[in-house]
Amino acid sequence: MKRFMDEDFLLNNKTAKVLYEKYAKDMPIVDFHCHLNPKEIYENKTFKNITEVWLGGDHYKWRLMRTNGIEEKYITGDADDYEKFLAWAKTIPMAIGNPIYHWTHLELKRYFGIDDVLNERSAPIIWEKTNKVLKELGARDIILKSNVEIICTTDDPIDTLEYHLKLKEDKDFNVKVYPTFRPDKGVNIERETFIPWVKKLAEVYGKKIESYDEFLDALKSRAEFFHSVGCRASDHAIDDMVFADASFDEVANIFKKALAGEKLTEIEFAKYKTYTLRFLGKVYSSLGWAMQLHINALRNNNTRMFNILGPDTGYDSINDGHIAFALVKFLDSLEKENSLPKTILYSLNPKDNYVLATIMGSFQGGGIPGKMQLGAAWWFNDSKDGNIQQMKDLANLGLLSRFVGMVTDSRSFLSYARHEYFRRLLCNLIGEWVENGEYPYDLETLGRIVQDICYYNAKEYFGF
């Protein structure tokens, strides 16, 4: 029987161990999609205790605690931090087979030097040990300890990027922190947030926005500003993939109606989103950016809890919407104008992997290695099985060797341990193929493939 999470954790063959130790383990991290707060990075935020850094905004953990019967007061409520930590310590032993069990203990090992298993018995001593370490461990220290080279945060076009600019000038911190352009609030015309957001966009743009062409000019201007601060990617939450062709005049009228507070139809929503996303795609192409599409999430399912806690609190799920037809139409509309940017396609529904991977193959080209990417296993799929399946699906239908690799997609500074988790799974999968006689034992080639997926592909793809 193997020991729990020893140095060969998840590495089940000799080739995997060689690949991980020699080629993957020490590669820097390019975290090209996360939700870290740049202000907290700039200020080197410190954490008063392990509860703040672990449970402060982690809806992955919150879902498990609710499932374990923990009362909400110990999750997002007014219980004190130690009580919340004990509630988590009571929950985590029940998470057998869940990646959060592995992530929790990897984080204890890598950042706190703790090999103990977290449970109700060990909780008091782990509370003391972690809090002692946290006195000397700020956000920047965690990032540096994780061997991170580049971080791409997720940012609204109306953001001033104040802290990205400050970080750019900070000579004492050699990690690059770049913004990512996420204009969802300007695309989702059906939501109550749309009109207030357009007003805020006008403020940062410095000009009135009373027409659709002025709105598009403002979006382009903000993208160019983001580019000047180092942005090389956009990100879009496409919960429902739609495509409805329309003329500029049609969409301009829809925009005008929206600003006037008039009720729009579903087809008008679709026409507006299609035209606006297509315009943005052309902007991204001209800037040399990558466009990330996160598809098929079903958000804020629990209305009662949404009204109490708001979004991103653990009440989302996988959607099962049809995406192929509309996605192909959208990508093709850009390709016909030679304006399709580099694109990373993520679906929260794993049934879509083959759909996305085959669609990608229809739009590769331009002399760009892996121009169209099947995004890493995301959110509910970020597990042992989910990561392996995503890599197998990509290998079956494309080139795994051109994969840009793992992202944390996280709000937690400790989540860089997930890169180690991914790298171990990657090396084990490749090792299995080699040891099964499905690929030659050519360490030079194998090592290069591993290092490319862990680091070089992403760095070259985004042009960092």
Swiss-Prot record:
Q: EC number(s) for this protein?
A: 5.3.1.12
* Iron-sulfur is among the record's keywords: no
Where in this chain does the entry annotate a coiled-coil region?
none
Keyword Ubl conjugation tagged? no
Going by the UniProt record, its keywords in alphabetical order are: Isomerase
Q: Name one GO biological process term.
A: D-galacturonate catabolic process
Task: Report the domain of life of the source organism.
Answer: Bacteria
Listed GO molecular functions? glucuronate isomerase activity
* Gene3D superfamilies reported for this sequence: Metal-dependent hydrolases, uronate isomerase, domain 2, chain A
> Which pathway does this polypeptide act in?
Carbohydrate metabolism; pentose and glucuronate interconversion
Q: What reaction(s) does this enzyme catalyze?
A: D-glucuronate = D-fructuronate; aldehydo-D-galacturonate = keto-D-tagaturonate
Concerning its family, UniProt says: Belongs to the metallo-dependent hydrolases superfamily. Uronate isomerase family.
* Cited NCBIfam families: PRK02925.1
What is the recorded name of this protein?
A: Uronate isomerase
